[in-house]
Amino acid sequence: MSTSTDWPSLASLLARQPDFDPDAVPVAQARELLADWVTPRVQARSMPAQAEAVGRVLARDVIARLDLPPCDNAAMDGYALCHADLNPEGDTTLPVGGRTLAGDPPATLPPGQAWRIMTGAPMPAGADTVVMQEHVRRHADDSALQGASSQPDGGACPSETITLPAGQKPGQNVRRRGEDIRTGQTALPAGRILSPMDLGVAASQGIVDLPVFDPLKVGVFSTGNELVQSGQPLAAGQIHDSNRPTLLALARSRGFEAIDLGWLPDDPAILTKALASSIDQVDVLLTTGGAAGGDADLLWHVLSQPMHHQGMSLPTEAHAWKLKLRPGRPLVIGRISQTPVFGLPGNPVAALLSFLFVIDAALQKMAGITTPRPLPRIRARAGTAIRKRPGRQELLRVTLCYHESDDLPVALPAGSQSSAQLRSVAEADGIAVLPEDQGPVAQGDRLDVVPLHGLL
């Protein structure tokens, strides 16, 4: 849906990669190349800085209008004073001249006195230090202060004195004006995924509306004669389509607008027409199936031919990669006019993991995210030996067991590791990442695991 025309072909980017081999693409290289290739595809708009903005991507820098804190204030309940009035060798006794609460106007500290102050209250003029109330001895109750507020004229309260020990540090327990945010600085950078804390920062600046990007529109097709939508009867040789619901939900969980484009048979004419007509509805297209290069795998062939839609010729681009990844080896990358197309494997687990480990960074960049969120990782111990040969990255579905006697969880395979076994992902706690150069894993070896809780 973007109107941008300044987008180089993937072929031109690959031409600058002398070591690139489309039949043996490392996962990290694939992820970086795709993120470098795509451009932001979303439009900006203004929306209230309320809870609905959480998860949206900030379109422009938010520049601070106010210092935060707006003035020097107390970080603790206690007594404000001038550090120069203290005896460095022993106890100091000072009369208390008044009291300031949070929200009161600033007072003025008379020389040689202390000032009762509460957390968040503005520091009196002439005071530079706060002593915690737990560190002083009070020599009279504060009944004379009940109901009193800040006294800008420095009016004394002779009924109370305090004694405090030596060792107080100048400036202690004081929050300085602007130490959190300074007027004119970038309070929130563009390209940031807004969090509840970010809304708090905006509110502290008196900001009512925020510039945000529209969610990236991710369209999802399933392809394959063997697929039938859930709820429909199955004929011999058919299966229910699990990929499309999974990818739509995954796209939505990543903050994108997921658009269900339905199912397509293995028919080049139907596939071509559906792909060409969909680019007006979405920012990026995902398909599952038809990526492996078999006789019935048509996506690369369709994307290799020019398309036409509503009387217009649509330029296309197509690349077929074999990733050094298990599961998830085949990947088709293409473009119809200015709309990128990612052809994911047909096996359910391979499609899911290809989304997360290969194309997610590119989708985030298209959504306007300046620094894509990496997948979180934790360390775990292998609960059993794992057979592996160097040469490709392997992703294992694992359950995690926690023991008080061990500082790391134990990772055990979660059922079958077949790329068609979706249930094993549903039962898994995480994905163990075995690097490309990794050989056999011994029981007890440390592993990197991407936890799935909160991710799927």
What are these regions (language model features)?
Residues 22-29, 45-48, 52, 76, ...:
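Conserved active-site and cofactor/substrate-binding residues in soluble primary-metabolism enzymes
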Residues 1-91, 116, 146, 151-153, ...:
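Short, low-complexity N-terminal leaders and the immediately following helix N-cap/first helix
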Residues 1-28, 210-344, 348-354:
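Helix-rich terminal scaffold detector
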Residues 28-31, 46, 50-51, 60, ...:
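Flexible glycine/proline-rich
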Residues 7-22, 80-260, 265, 415-416, ...:
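Short, glycine/charged-enriched hinge/interface segments at domain edges or termini
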Residues 72-74, 86-89, 106-110, 123-124, ...:
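Solvent-exposed alpha-helices and their adjacent loops that cap or buttress functional pockets
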Residues 58, 70-71, 105, 113, ...:
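Short, conserved secondary-structure segments in the cores of folded domains
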